[in-house]
C-alpha cells in the first residue's frame, strides 16, 4: 500500500482550531497538551518511525482540549490526545468522550500509570508524572531583597504584590491541579480564602500552565506557580530560576493520553498510543528539556527531574477531582470569587 499524505498543520502559537478542523481528514489528528518543544519532537520522531503516517497536530492546554473534545463529541475531529494533566482526561473518560483501549505496553508501566488506566476503565493512561510547585527568578529576588518562599503561606507576603503569575484553571490543567491541591490541603472554604488573598499578588492569570515560569525566566515576573519540571527546564536553559516544593505539601499530575471516541483514524491512533509508551520514546523526552518522570519502568529518568521521594506529596484524589461535576463546581466558584476580582 502506498504512503498516504495530508497537509500538515503548522505547529506554533498561532495555529488555529479552524486550520486544524479544515485538515481533519488526515492520517492522524493529534492534540498535544505538553510544551510546544516536546510536542514538536514527539511529532517528528513518530513520523520518522512511521513514515506512512502524517501527523496533523495542534498544541492546546488540557482544559481547552477537554472543552474542544466535548464540543465535538457528535463529530470528532481529533483522533488522539497526548499529554496534559490527568484530571481533564479522567473527566473526558467519565463522560464517555474517549475510547477504552488496553495497550500491549501496559505491563511495562509504573503502578501510578496503570492505576490511571484502571480508574478510567482503560479510557486513558499515564505517560509521565510531575509535582506542583513554583520557580522564582533569583536575580529579581536579589535585586529586590525578597525572601525565598518555601511554603504556600509565604506567597501571601505583601512584598510579592504584582510579582506572581499562575495560569487560569479554566484553560490550564496545571492551574486546575493547583486549585484542587489547595482544596485538598486546606479544605475548600479555606482554600478559596487563601486564593482571594493570593489574588492581590497575582499580576496575570495566563492561558498556558508553563507560561508563568517562562515569564519569570525572562524577568517579567518574580514567581511562576507551575509544575516543578517546567521550572527545572528553564534552569536547564540557563535562566536564573530556582525551583521550590511547598513545605505544607503539594499535589501532582499524571500526564495522560487518550484516544477520542469516534476517532476517524483509529488504527493510527492506537499506533501512536503504543509507540508513546515505549521506553526509548520516553527516554528521549529529556532532549526537549522535558523533565517529567516517565511512566515506562525501563525509561531513563532525567537526572534533572524532581523526584517524588524528595517532595512532600499529598494523596491527590484523582477520582474526585477528575469528576466533571466537581470540576464545574470548583471552576464556577473560582470565576465568582477569584476571577471576578482579578487585578
Q: Which functions belong to the PLM regions below?
A:
Residues 87-91, 217, 222-240:
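A ligand-binding cleft/hinge motif common to bilobed small-molecule-binding domains
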